[in-house]
Structures are given as C-alpha cells and as structure tokens.
Design a protein with these regions (language model features):
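Two-component/phosphorelay signaling modules centered on CheY-like receiver
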Residues: 11-32
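As written
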Residues: 49, 63, 75-76, 95-100
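Active-site residues of response regulator receiver
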Residues: 8, 55
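Receiver (REC) domain active-site loop signature in two-component systems and cognate sites
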Residues: 58
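Acidic, metal-coordinating helix/loop segments flanking the phosphotransfer/catalytic sites
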Residues: 33-51
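Acidic catalytic/metal-coordinating carboxylates
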Residues: 36-39, 62-65, 83
Length: 163
C-alpha cells in the first residue's frame, strides 16, 4: 500500500478528502491527518509517506516551509498542495521546490485523482516505491454524498461536470 498523509487546518476538509475517493481501492492508505504544519512535517520525517496532501497555509509551519525543508533534506515524499490562494507566488514557490501539483479549493475530484496518478506513475520522482498496477481510468468507487456544512461542501467535492 502507498502511504499518504493529509494536512489542513480545517478538519472538515481532510475528512471530506478522505471520503471523496475510495483510497483503499487505489492502493493508498491514509496514515495520518494533521491540523498544523509542524505536525505534518514531523509525520513526513517520521513515517516517510509516499504522498503528502497539504494545505499551503497552516499554523506553525506553512506548506511552502514544509516543502522547502523536505527539499533540503532530500525527502522522497511527493507533495500535492491544496489551497484557497490563487496568487502566482504560492504556486511558483511550491513548484520551485518540487511539488507534484498545486490544486485550488474547491478541489475537483478528477483533478485530485490526476495529481495522485502523477505521484504513482512518475518514475523520475524519487518517492515512487509502489510497483503495483493501479487503474485510474475508472471512477475509483462511487461515493455517497458526504454530509458537511453547506458553506464548506463546495470547497472539496465538486466534479468537472459541475463547473
């Protein structure tokens, strides 16, 4: 199984992402959820997940700080950012340090699947350790509608068809 962590200072977002996709069907195990950057960074160092799905703006340590430190330590974790910030500087900094992808909130399920696929199928990236055959062409399992407050729901569970 591929190990992945989630980090966002809004727990409803991490819970929603957990329920958005049938991760187990993709061969991915979510091994931790974190609400601040320091805890997420400690988990990356301690658990060495193949994938870290991070909010770019968190208390304690920003996502850019995390990827900068990971880059300096030559961590093998693929980092995907999820952010409400559309400023070019955030995306540029993230990509300069080797982020696999930078997704804007509201996260679109299909875009998240494509970002995860990049992590799993990208041999030039040092973090790929999974040798199995994962099928990303399907729907990764149909999910029932997730109950979250109406004001937050659109932030993480739209599909491309709804745009």
């Amino acid at each position: 199984m591929i190990k992945m962590i989630l980090a966002d200072d809004e727990p409803v977002i991490t819970r929603g992402i957990r329920k958005l996709i049938d991760w187990e069907q993709l061969g991915i195990q979510i091994i931790g959820e974190y609400e601040d950057g320091k805890s997420a960074f400690a988990a990356i160092l301690r658990d060495q997940p193949e994938i870290a799905l991070l909010d770019i703006s968190m208390p304690g340590m920003s996502g850019v700080d995390i990827i900068r430190e990971c880059h300096g330590l030559q961590c093998k974790t693929h980092i995907i950012f999820i952010s409400g910030f559309q400023e070019f500087e955030y995306a540029k900094a993230a990509l300069d340090y080797g982020a696999t992808d930078y997704l804007l909130k509201p996260v679109i399920r299909e875009e998240l699947l494509k970002a995860i696929e990049k992590c799993v199928k990208s041999p030039e990236q040092p973090g790929v350790t999974y040798k199995g055959n994962i099928d990303f062409s399907g729907d990764a399992g149909e999910q029932e509608q997730i109950y979250v407050p109406v004001c937050v729901y659109p932030m993480f569970c739209r599909s491309e068809k709804e745009q």
